[in-house]
């Protein structure tokens, strides 16, 4: 996400401050997990990892993510960059992918049919690794 949102930034601390404790409850974590559309067999690992994140770290991570923007010099990048975005992702994520693609001259963008955010690398890990190996082997 490369579209900063000051409003989102300002809402993260009060929202997570008031409901952070809920992540320790499995019923709540299952609701979160379901919304992420991750394979069900990964829930135990997700729950363990989520419970290990300190409140201050979670807030800091989410706040920084909400105000991230591309640096002015990004256009000077000489790397060939692959950009994957799910067809079913939020518009802000699709727009961010397009912005990155437009700023990077040698970038390639692919919209992945019927996929949500993170689904390619998590739920289709074999395909994701195969794609990475193709990229590495082309060098």
Where in the sequence are the language-model features?
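Short beta-strand/loop motif that positions the catalytic acidic residue
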Residues: 76-77, 83-85
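Flexible "cap/lid" loop of the alpha/beta hydrolase fold
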Residues: 1-22
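Hydrophobic, aromatic-rich cap/lid helix
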Residues: 44-71
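Conserved alpha/beta-hydrolase "acid-adjacent" motif
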Residues: 90-96
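Short, conserved loop/helix-junction motifs that constitute active-site signature segments
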Residues: 74-78, 102-105
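Catalytic histidine-centered segment of alpha/beta-hydrolase-like enzymes
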Residues: 112-129
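C-terminal alpha-helix
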Residues: 127, 131-139
């Amino acid at each position: 996400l490369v579209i900063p949102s000051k409003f989102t930034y300002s809402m993260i601390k009060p929202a997570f401050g008031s409901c952070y404790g809920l992540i320790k409850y499995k019923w709540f974590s299952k609701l979160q997990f379901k919304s992420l559309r991750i394979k069900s067999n990964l829930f135990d690992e997700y729950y363990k990892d989520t419970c290990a994140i300190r409140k201050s770290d979670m807030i800091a991570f989410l706040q920084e993510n909400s105000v991230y923007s591309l640096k002015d010099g990004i256009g000077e990048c000489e790397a060939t960059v692959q950009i994957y975005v799910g067809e079913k992702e939020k518009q802000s994520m699709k727009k961010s992918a397009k912005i990155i693609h437009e700023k990077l001259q040698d970038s390639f963008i692919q919209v992945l049919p019927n996929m949500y955010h993170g689904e390619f690398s998590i739920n289709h890990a074999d395909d994701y690794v195969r794609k990475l190996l193709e990229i590495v082997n082309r060098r």
